């Protein structure tokens, strides 16, 4: 990404277990399909609040709503080769301001764009010139301070930082040395998570060890920590989220052909990413593409690993340790306790990404433009 008589204790334990299971089941979310007005695959989603949400996908397409998803407006970012370019990550800042990250077959297809007028026009802020670079994801601490992460090139991560929301500078010299073949996965735009004023975590795979790269000072210095997730050319950590500076969850696994449940893996950390422990097996049949807490305290805007600025309505339920995972064709699930127990979302399949503004307002996006609103009681 473990007195009273024994008989009395056993039955009391069973009673508490049954109550806990019933209570958790009663918290099953309400799932509401929404019409995105596109048939393109949607890969990443970023709620700003309960009303404003941005999502992006193939064909350089973006969609945005300002009414909580009742209506969605579609558009195309004018990328270098729009038909062949995919938008793999998005950071919503407001109904007018958003950033997107593009990838493609050409070196220059990897780029960052920004709009300040709701998607009417877009400005290219960065265009890749490094052969072999593959920018998987980005995340922001503030509306103008963010980090973009790439697969390694010749043992170096050519990562980028912006401190003004306009220009991007290399921090390759700050990054820890890469393992042979070390890379990340652009499955949902959540391979990097930000928190507070300078904390960030990057999930990797592709090599002999799946690692977390971590910084506490905005990318000036980094440490690398091993995780127990499987790793290999198509295996590792895909998605990472932190609910505060200490507690986080990591999702991933293997993309090998088949439907074995053990292809999906999740792990948690309670020391800022230094050590990780596998959770119980998630009930999905494919590598976890995305993991998101219901109440985020990281970054700017909602968007998976970014901070929802709106407040959830008052609820007797403590959602602190709740998280939702998506696994494309393998299904989706949620946990109320960071992976000790899991509940499958029956019939939910084909979704790549999930993100929450608050527990009552979350969105999944995926194949054929599908959007599903996720609302916990």
Can you annotate each of these PLM segments?
Residues 10-20:
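Bacterial N-terminal signal peptides
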Residues 25-377:
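Residue-level hotspots at or immediately adjacent to binding/recognition sites across diverse folds
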Residues 1-2, 15, 311:
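Generic N-terminal leader/processing signal
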Residues 2-10:
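Bacterial N-terminal signal peptides that target proteins for export
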């Amino acid at each position: 990404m473990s007195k009273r008589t024994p008989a009395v204790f056993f039955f009391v334990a069973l009673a508490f277990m049954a109550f806990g299971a019933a209570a958790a089941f009663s918290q099953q979310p309400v799932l509401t399909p929404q019409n995105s007005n596109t048939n393109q695959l949607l890969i990443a989603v970023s709620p700003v609040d309960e009303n404003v949400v941005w999502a992006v996908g193939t064909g350089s397409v973006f969609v945005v709503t300002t009414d909580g998803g009742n209506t969605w407006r579609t558009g195309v970012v004018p990328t270098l080769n729009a038909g062949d370019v995919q938008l793999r990550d998005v950071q919503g800042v407001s109904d007018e301001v958003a950033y997107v990250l593009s990838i493609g077959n050409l070196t220059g297809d990897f780029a960052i764009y920004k709009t300040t007028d709701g998607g009417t026009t877009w400005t290219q802020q960065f265009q890749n010139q490094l052969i072999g670079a593959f920018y998987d994801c980005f995340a922001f601490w503030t509306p103008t301070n963010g980090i973009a992460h790439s697969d390694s090139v010749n043992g170096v991560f050519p990562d980028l930082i912006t401190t003004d929301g306009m220009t991007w500078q290399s921090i390759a010299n700050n990054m820890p040395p890469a393992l042979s073949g070390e890379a990340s996965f652009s499955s949902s735009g959540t391979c990097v998570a930000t928190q507070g004023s300078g904390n960030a975590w990057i999930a990797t795979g592709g090599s002999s060890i799946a690692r977390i790269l971590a910084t506490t000072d905005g990318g000036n210095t980094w440490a690398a920590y091993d995780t127990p997730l499987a790793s290999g050319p198509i295996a590792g950590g895909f998605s990472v989220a932190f609910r505060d500076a200490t507690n986080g969850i990591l999702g991933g696994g293997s993309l090998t052909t088949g439907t074995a449940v053990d292809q999906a893996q999740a792990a948690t950390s309670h020391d800022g990413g230094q050590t990780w422990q596998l959770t119980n097996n998630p009930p999905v049949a494919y590598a976890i593409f995305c993991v998101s807490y219901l109440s985020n305290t990281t970054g700017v805007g909602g968007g998976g690993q970014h901070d929802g600025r709106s407040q959830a309505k008052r609820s007797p339920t403590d959602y602190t340790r709740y998280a939702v995972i998506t696994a494309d064709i393998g299904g989706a699930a949620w946990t109320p306790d960071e992976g000790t127990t899991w509940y499958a979302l029956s019939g939910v399949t084909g979704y790549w990404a999930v993100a929450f503004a608050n527990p009552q307002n979350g969105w999944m996006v995926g194949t054929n433009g599908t959007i599903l609103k996720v609302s916990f009681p």
